[in-house]
């Protein structure tokens, strides 16, 4: 049965349009779009997009309440970034390459830290008045923003991330000491956790269940500088409204006082000490420069790389 002339004309036009060059061009464009995340300059776009959102779009000179609407401290709240694993970021085993974990962490942790600490890092967001630990200093104002620097990072890989797999990066402040603020991050399977951080379906808080959804766990530490002087994290936390100024407990602004657990300095200190148990092991790596053994160990070989 012969096809109508209009259909034959259409098929002929389509066939004439499809050429090897056009097929290759289309495949190349599709490949680039599929792997856009790993292309040169995209990391910078992702980073500055987060900075723009926190420092410009969400600019505010008034710190948010100490607790959220459910009475939980904002300091320990997670910041979540949804990601994917393009083929260009895979290694020869077709798993997410080790180095690319850190580029995702850069984006996620930067926005987390800017969300928490923009009131001391950005001139436009600095409060007009700054309170100190004893509640005084109402007429004070920070003259210039602080500088924040990363002082170390580590990552443990638990499960492979396959090509094009979707996942989420969850980061929060774990603890702080006299110098460092420690941030813990988790790569988790997309859809394993609800928006409020609870497990979905039959999952619970059992550590064995956690291991099934946690793909990687990471830790980093940050220091705040005023010129060359290190600023104690507790002071920074208080200026940003993340740590109580007085001993009395406080309740969430929108929550009923009778139904919300109180959080004061004692509760924050208890959580901090618990986090320092893990963070202290990370800081224990400070001794590594003393264990080089350069004068005692031989050299297997030397080669030039890019």
From Swiss-Prot:
GO molecular function: transferase activity
Induction of expression: Expression is positively regulated by the aspercryptin cluser-specific transcription factor atnN.
Keyword Transferase appears in the UniProt entry: yes
InterPro entries given in the database record: HotDog_dom_sf, THEM6_lcsJ_thioesterase
One family name in Pfam for this protein: 4HBT_2
Keyword Transferase: yes
UniProt note: phenotype after gene disruption: Does not alter the yield of aspercryptin significantly.
EC number(s) given by UniProt: 2.3.1.-
Top-level taxon in the UniProt lineage: Eukaryota
Alphabetical list of CDD domains matching this protein: 4HBT
Signal peptide: none
Alphabetical keyword list: Transferase
Family the entry assigns: Belongs to the lcsJ thioesterase family.
Its biological purpose: Part of the gene cluster that mediates the biosynthesis of aspercryptins, linear lipopeptides built from six amino acids including 2 highly unusual and nonproteogenic amino acids, 2-amino-octanoic acid (2aoa) and 2-amino-dodecanol (2adol). The core structure of aspercryptins is as follows: Ser/Ala-Thr-Ile/Val-2aoa-Asn-2adol. The first step of aspercryptin biosynthesis is the generation of the fatty acid precursors, octanoic and dodecanoic acids, by the FAS subunits atnF and atnM. The fatty acid precursors are likely transformed into the corresponding alpha-amino fatty acids in three steps.
Protein name in the entry: Probable thioesterase atnL
């Amino acid at each position: 049965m012969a096809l109508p002339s209009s259909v034959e004309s259409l098929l002929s036009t389509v066939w004439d349009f499809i050429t090897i060059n056009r097929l290759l061009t289309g495949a190349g464009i599709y490949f680039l779009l599929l792997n856009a995340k790993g292309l040169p300059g995209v990391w910078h776009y992702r980073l500055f997009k987060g900075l723009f959102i926190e420092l410009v779009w969400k600019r505010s000179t008034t710190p948010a309440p100490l607790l959220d609407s459910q009475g939980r401290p904002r300091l320990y709240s997670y910041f979540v970034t949804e990601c994917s694993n393009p083929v260009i970021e895979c290694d020869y085993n077709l798993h997410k390459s080790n180095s690319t974990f850190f580029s995702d962490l850069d984006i996620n942790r930067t926005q987390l830290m800017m969300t928490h600490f923009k009131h001391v890092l950005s001139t436009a967001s600095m409060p007009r008045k700054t309170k100190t630990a004893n509640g005084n200093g109402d007429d004070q104002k920070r003259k210039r923003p602080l500088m924040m620097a990363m002082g170390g990072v580590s990552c443990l890989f638990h499960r492979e991330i396959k090509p094009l797999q979707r996942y989420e990066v969850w980061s929060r402040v774990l603890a702080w000491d006299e110098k460092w603020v420690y941030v813990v991050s988790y790569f988790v399977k997309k859809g394993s956790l609800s928006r409020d951080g609870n497990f979905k379906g039959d999952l619970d808080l059992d550590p064995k269940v956690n291991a099934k959804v946690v793909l990687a766990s990471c830790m980093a530490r940050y220091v705040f500088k005023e010129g060359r002087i290190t600023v104690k994290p507790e002071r920074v936390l208080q200026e940003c409204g993340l740590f109580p100024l007085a001993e009395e407990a406080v309740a969430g602004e929108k929550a009923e006082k009778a139904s919300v657990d109180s959080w004061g300095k004692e509760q924050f200190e208890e959580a901090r000490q618990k986090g320092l148990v893990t963070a202290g092991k990370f800081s224990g790596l400070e001794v590594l420069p003393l264990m080089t053994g350069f004068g005692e160990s031989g050299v297997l070989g030397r080669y030039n790389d890019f």
